[in-house]
Amino acid sequence: MKLLYTEISYSMTEILVKEARAYADKGYRVFYIAPNSLSFEKERSVLALLPEQGSFAITVTRFEQMARYFTLAKAANRQALDDNGLAMIFYRVLMQLQEDELKVFHRLRTDQAFIAQLVELYKELQAANLTAFDLTTLDRPEKQEDLITIMTKAEQLIAQGDYDQSSRLAQLAEAIKSKSLDDELRQTVLVIDGFTRFSAEEEQLLALLNEACEEIVIGAYISQKAYRLAFTKGNLYEASLAFIQQLAQQFQTKPIYTTSEKVFDVSFSRLTQLLEANHDYSKLDWQLSAKDKSKVVIWQALNQKEELEYVAKAIREKLYQGYRYKDMLVLLGDVASYQLQIGPIFEKFEIPYYIGKQEPMSAHPLVQFVESLERGRRYNWRREDIVNLLKSGLFGRFQEGELDQLEQYLVFADIQGFTKFSRPFTLNSSRQYPLPLLNQLRLAVVTPLQQLFKSQKQLGASLLDKLMTFFKTIQLADNFEALAGSRREADREKDEEVWKAFTGILETFYQVFGQEKMTLADCLALIKMGMQTAHYRTVPATLDVVSIKSYDLVEPHSKPFVFAIGLSRSHFPKQTKNTSLISDQERASINEQTASYQRLDVPSFENIKKNHQTALSLFNAATQELVLSLPTSLTNSSDDVSPYLKELIALGVPVIEKGKNRLSHSAADIGNYKALLSRLVAINRQGIADDMTSEDRNFWTVALRYLKRRLADEQLSLPAFEHHLTTKPVAPEVIETRFPSHQPLSLSSSALTVFYNNQYKYFLKYVLGLQEPESIHPDARIHGQYLHRIFELVTKDRTDAAFDQKLGAAIAAVNQQSAFQQVYQADAEGRYSLEVLKGIAYSTAPVLNLNQGMQVAKQEEAFELALGHQALIRGVIDRIDQLADGRLGIVDYKSSARVFDIGAFYNGLSPQLVTYLAALKNKGQGLFGAMYLHMQEPRLSLSDFKVLDDQLVAAAYKELTYKGIFLAQAKEYLANGSYHLNNTLYETDELETLLAYNEQLYLSAVKQIKTGHFLINPYTADGKSVQGDQLKAITRFEADLDLGYARRLVVLPVKERRQAFLTRMNEEIKHED
């Protein structure tokens, strides 16, 4: 074994390539081994250093892939399971285990995260040359027992599928021990680059290869100064030192210092030397020069978006200087938080990029299809699962409009379960659903699903055949191809990888579970688990892209220009978290009991060494310029400066406060078409910034004027998102069609209430005619109709029967009416609602019997009230009562508590009672009032009563009173009845004021409606919160941001509140006159 080390300013890759080429020239087969995370980039750099740009004698690969070269012929018919297959294996094992067979993990049997942890533990035990039986020092013996049970059954299933149970490295080790590869290995040389540690499995293999191969060459970056130190704890090179020294001791060889012909920029090595001195407690008598400081710089931006835009502009600027995209590397401190923002910003600046990261498939439509299919079977045709299955776009050939209609009907008719799906749709409503079309769609959905779901327990291979027939029937492959064809090229590549993973999962299922009997539910659950845990990785279509990856995967001298962003304290250094099933303490305890070449990694123990090594690689990642950046605000929370960056700042590395992106006329701002257009749009929205220089302001003013002129020629306009709640008037011809000018505008009190609640809601409901989803299940409207009908029959009954008998007969008659039978007898929920309503009827109806001096004159009385030629008000009055003197009163039944509030009326939110009074007064009828009757079952707190006597009954009846507007002149007729008269009596002139103001409310609304301009203005009572309907899903109204759009109600002090509102009404009436 030959161990080589060199200074960070030299190229270890060049040194090792030179070694590899020398052995290749002698006729040896050379394997150039790199870590998994660096193998792709390492292959490029190695081939670039070879004079021929390639060699058949030198293979750049990974340990596992090298093992395949030697063992492929020995295991020709056996394959290793990938992570998806292992996830399916463990899920099947956990499905078969009973709850009492697992003492610790029994509650996690179906947990996806737990299954992922089992997969990782299985692979980790292989790499550590351990089994579950070796985990003898876990905190709880029951934990080891559970793991032994799970792992043993998993290995049995793997053997059943004739898959390899051992890793490729273990197979190669066994082959070497058997001497079957001696001849090949004598002509083999290994060159190992980029490692600072080996796993136990790799160590064992390396020891065997050292005896069998011609030579093993291993290189690492270590400074001569660090190599000579006796104490290396905390040294910047500690990881590499420990790595090389351990190998030197084990294989009895002395590391050799060497250099390369290529020497990188001395500025980076000078910075490294200063950092090294900080960590080995030595001193240097020099500092960074001006040239050194020009090579390394620290940016501090406001947030992630600003940070990425500065990086994008810097990349564009390098392009103008003649560099290529492939010369740039972007490193991320936290990939998850930056990944979503990179795409839009880099696309705006037209920068092609590649993120070298595995992505989960869970959000892909194919995974959603599989999940919905499995849930549809498991939950017996649950509606949302069937709808999600259809909406995936992979089931059959349906038009989007057809699916919308089907979904609406399924919600309306409450279609749940196979029984309802299998029967023809017959229910309909006033909306007249197209039942023939819907039944055609129902058959197209139900027929293939029913054929699949009726499959009985059988061999997995048979179930898979039925599943493939189902896929063919619904045209899954064709639909997937159509879906991929409609997407961007980058997404099409992802689709291809997802399809490969899907077919691979089906093949694995056939191989492992093909001869095992199981139910269809188990079959679908296994495939779903494989899909949920699957990941995919795409490769760039071209090499000329900006590479993006996590900063801890970088190696020295990667690219000429490196931008490392997001280097806040939270992410630089990285804090390793152990999320496995075995804690760090348990790992350390296990390692103490194991033999040589058996070892579990203990992440926290290696954390400091690993972070120092990462920082060393990062600070030397660039060959020309290095930018280290951090946002002051990271995902909406401020973060401190990284300790490594603090070191650099102390050494004199300059810090640039980037601040907010300023618009200028520099090449970085105007040299790219999309970015320039984006900036012009931003200026149009925000205006020319005051802090621009006069030259910049002139440039952008002229550019914006030019753009607007060009857009006007093309009949286009710039969006104005800062006024995102500003609405446009409806075209006059549309208003004329909807509300003809020669006809009065038809309104109702409820429509007027909607208008003053939020004008835009009126537009949606009464102009566009949008309707809320309906249901066959009874709602508040149906409940109200039911009680109305009962009260109508009771009041019409003029027989001498007792009141309770009349009420019972009315309830029985209403229950027999088909309209109510259909909704209240359909299911248990409806029957329960019916019992509740009967209780309310028995509680409220006695009020009808208390006012003996009152007669019911009319019920369900329709009316029309004309306001000149401008408006026609229509409505229906629930009940009209008549006093002995002939005066009429209006009763409106309510299912919730309501009172007449003069403030709400003034603000247009409660016009109903006054509108009804106006309708009767218009007919020349005398009036005594208008009132609400709350249909309820009074609820009283018994703790409020000392004695359960007649006071309890009186209190119950007090809740059942008429509340509203009453004429003071009628008080003597009402005093002994069930009327709430406190502060509800109005004089005749006051009532006239209410009626006149009510007319003004209608006419003002009509005037605004006729303009066709409807504001998004939900009302606010206190100016702090919004009480009106915000319609967030449609308008994007946010109360905390858009409070200025809300309509502020007029709110007056409680003292003399009624008189104050009446005064304001009179003033406004006079003003209008």
From Swiss-Prot:
It is an enzyme of class 3 (hydrolase). Its cofactor is Mg(2+). Keywords: ATP-binding, DNA damage, DNA repair, DNA-binding, Exonuclease, Helicase, Hydrolase, Nuclease, Nucleotide-binding. The heterodimer acts as both an ATP-dependent DNA helicase and an ATP-dependent, dual-direction single-stranded exonuclease. Recognizes the chi site generating a DNA molecule suitable for the initiation of homologous recombination. This subunit has 5' -> 3' nuclease activity but not helicase activity. Signal peptide: none annotated. Disulfide bonds: none annotated. One of its GO terms (molecular function) is helicase activity. Its EC number is 3.1.-.-. SUPFAM superfamilies: P-loop containing nucleoside triphosphate hydrolases (SSF52540), Restriction endonuclease-like (SSF52980). This is ATP-dependent helicase/deoxyribonuclease subunit B.
